[in-house]
Amino acid sequence: MAGMSALKRLAPFAHVGGHLFRGRCARAAGARGVRRAGGGAHIEPRYRQFPQLTRSQVIQAEFFSATMWFWILWRFWHDSDAVLGHFPYPDPSQWTDEELGIPPDDED
């Protein structure tokens, strides 16, 4: 009994799968399906030429570029340690000869 109820629940999926299989065979035979495209390319490609940009694309590019550089420069100005390092460079005059590996003067 439990097996039959599981098969009944899977029946709609088998039905849809059959439509997908028949649709693929029909397209292979040359039948045309429903085309849901909005025509050709929005901007036709041109061989070895810079693409023709719309005014909207130029404005969007300028906006995102300005936003990116503002963010980079803002973060660099206010949190430069993230780029340059978190710790101050040590003062070499404070280093001892022992730390530098220099033997004491009294040794021959």
Curated annotation (Swiss-Prot):
Q: Which residues does the Swiss-Prot or TrEMBL entry list as transit peptide?
A: 1-36
Q: Where is this region: Disordered?
A: 89-108
Q: Has keyword Iron?
A: no
Keyword terms, alphabetized = Electron transport, Membrane, Mitochondrion, Mitochondrion inner membrane, Respiratory chain, Transit peptide, Transport
Q: Which GO terms describe its cellular component?
A: mitochondrial inner membrane; mitochondrion; respiratory chain complex I
Topology versus the membrane: Peripheral membrane protein
Acidic residues bias: where? Answer: 96-108
Cellular localisation: Mitochondrion inner membrane
Q: Name one GO biological process term.
A: mitochondrial respiratory chain complex I assembly
Subunit structure comment from the entry: Complex I is composed of 45 different subunits.
Entry-linked PANTHER family: NADH DEHYDROGENASE [UBIQUINONE] 1 BETA SUBCOMPLEX SUBUNIT 2, MITOCHONDRIAL, NADH-UBIQUINONE OXIDOREDUCTASE AGGG SUBUNIT
The entry assigns this protein to a family as follows: Belongs to the complex I NDUFB2 subunit family.
| Role description | Accessory subunit of the mitochondrial membrane respiratory chain NADH dehydrogenase (Complex I), that is believed not to be involved in catalysis. Complex I functions in the transfer of electrons from NADH to the respiratory chain. The immediate electron acceptor for the enzyme is believed to be ubiquinone.
What protein am I looking at? Answer: NADH dehydrogenase [ubiquinone] 1 beta subcomplex subunit 2, mitochondrial
* Organism expressing this protein natively: Bos taurus (Bovine)
